[in-house]
């Protein structure tokens, strides 16, 4: 079976778990490795913490207790984040999360591409497409970013 551009056949083909997670849109491959190392991923009921673990189409893969499937619909969401929200998926300080501003009908697990500070406002992108996120978010993409900064203090021309 070929799904989302990768060959994965339950009879003979296996792929590394972090690659599978990236293709499912859970996170980039590197971020998927961190999920695995932190014990947040299980395969067929067993928590996996070793990189390079191979999986098949028929395996039950959970991230934070939620099932992950290759057939997942890709989502791309642009949000004008207001100041006073954090871009992380969780905040130990209990501050409001930007993802909570997304429509409730978005049931897929999405995460931000890039970050804006808590006090900053502006465009932030959410997706469940790990390859897309890596292409935009990785420094090697060398994408230009533009910021408008307002200051109450005069800024010298130098």
What are these regions (language model features)?
Residues 2-158:
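Basic, flexible Lys/Arg- and Gly-enriched helix-loop patches that mediate nucleic-acid binding at interfaces
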